[in-house]
């Protein structure tokens, strides 16, 4: 689930190439779900770019080549250090669906991030793919575990750039029970023992 969605992915203009990025931050990696949906008026240009042999079918080599082009236009940094993104999965619609403005390219990207200490961190995501005809959306996803907490998100007006401030906690901090409930529980236990002792004393006296 996205923490804050700026607009509806389904509502895009026919003359735009809608690119929606959802970014998941985990302690040792960053996952990016990138959905690319060309409107009907720009789809023919995109199909021509992907279908290099003009046979009306988006072949495996052609989709791999286009995915590589997208990857070159996308950037990721953590604490001002560039991170290498790799392709986990890619799904391409049929040509007919794309020409009707109904086809979405789904890309799953991931970067391994190592050596991060507990504390504050900043992620920067950049998307410069087909900037001349594109509309962009970018949002952080709710982290899967308790070790990562997203604090703020900042976007440029076009949403080609997204900065995410987040906090990374130690695994021990995540596992350690909160101090306040522990103290309250101890006080309650002592109070109960004192009450039972007083009750037994009263019975003995009676």
What are the functions of these language-model segments?
Residues 189-200:
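Alpha-helical transmembrane segments
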């Amino acid at each position: 689930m996205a923490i804050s969605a700026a607009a509806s992915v389904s509502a895009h203009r026919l003359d735009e190439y809608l690119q929606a990025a959802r970014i998941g931050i985990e302690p040792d990696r960053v996952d990016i779900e990138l959905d690319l949906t060309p409107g009907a008026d720009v789809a023919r240009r995109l199909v021509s770019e992907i279908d290099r042999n003009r046979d009306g079918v988006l072949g495996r080599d052609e989709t791999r080549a286009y995915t590589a082009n997208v990857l070159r236009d996308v950037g990721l940094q953590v604490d001002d250090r560039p991170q290498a993104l790799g392709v986990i999965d890619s799904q391409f619609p049929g040509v007919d669906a794309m020409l009707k403005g109904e086809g979405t390219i789904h890309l799953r990207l991931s970067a391994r991030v190592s050596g991060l200490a507990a504390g504050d961190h900043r992620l920067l995501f950049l998307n410069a793919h087909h900037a001349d005809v594109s509309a962009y959306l970018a949002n952080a996803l709710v982290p899967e575990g308790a070790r990562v907490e997203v604090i703020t998100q900042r976007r440029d007006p076009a949403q080609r750039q997204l900065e995410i401030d987040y906090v990374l906690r130690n695994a021990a901090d995540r596992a350690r029970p909160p101090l306040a409930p522990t103290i309250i529980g101890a006080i309650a236990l002592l109070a109960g023992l004192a009450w039972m002792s007083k009750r037994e004393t009263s019975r003995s006296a009676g």
